[in-house]
Amino acid sequence: MIRVDVHIPKWDYEVSCFFAVTEYWVDDIMEELFYLQIDSENARRAYDNLNSGELDTGLCFANPRQRKAIIVVAKASSAAEFINSVSHENHHLASYVAKQFDLDPTGEEVAYFAGELMKEQFPYIKHLMCDCCRKKVYHERVHSEDSRFGIIGKEVLPYYE
């Protein structure tokens, strides 16, 4: 799993992003969701989604009063599916922000929010956006002599076929 904490200054919004998530991380992510005061129905749906082990899924939850949100993207079957899932969940958050601040959902302000979010996420997830890079990074980290298999700083690498 890769965690990226993003602050969008213009809206004073904090976003915790979790990428390449597996069932192993369900409890940690549910704890974060409860901190944001997720309601019981959405908590059950989130738990079921996270615990399913399905590829190419995700979720987004925001607490407008706290100006905080969580984006979760599961492991992906391909780089294209990963990009699709990230943009899908980022779009949900941009839509929530548009509603919260009474912005035109098709307007520039919402597009800038989505762009800032992706710009902050990109350095941490760029290697997941290319199938060749995904396999290369996995191979290098697993087979390096000083590898701590899977954990590099804040990164916990997902398994790739």
Language model regions located:
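Non-catalytic terminal regions of proteins
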Residues: 1-52, 158
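Active-site scaffold of zinc-dependent metalloenzymes
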Residues: 36-80
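Short His-Asn-centered micro-motif
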Residues: 72-76, 96, 115
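Alpha-helical hydrophobic/aromatic positions enriched in membrane-embedded helices and signal peptides
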Residues: 80-84, 100
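Active-site recognition of the HExxH zinc-binding catalytic motif
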Residues: 84-96
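Short helix/strand-bridging catalytic loops that position acidic/His residues to coordinate divalent metals
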Residues: 96-102
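Post-HExxH zinc-binding segment in Zn-dependent metallohydrolases
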Residues: 104-134
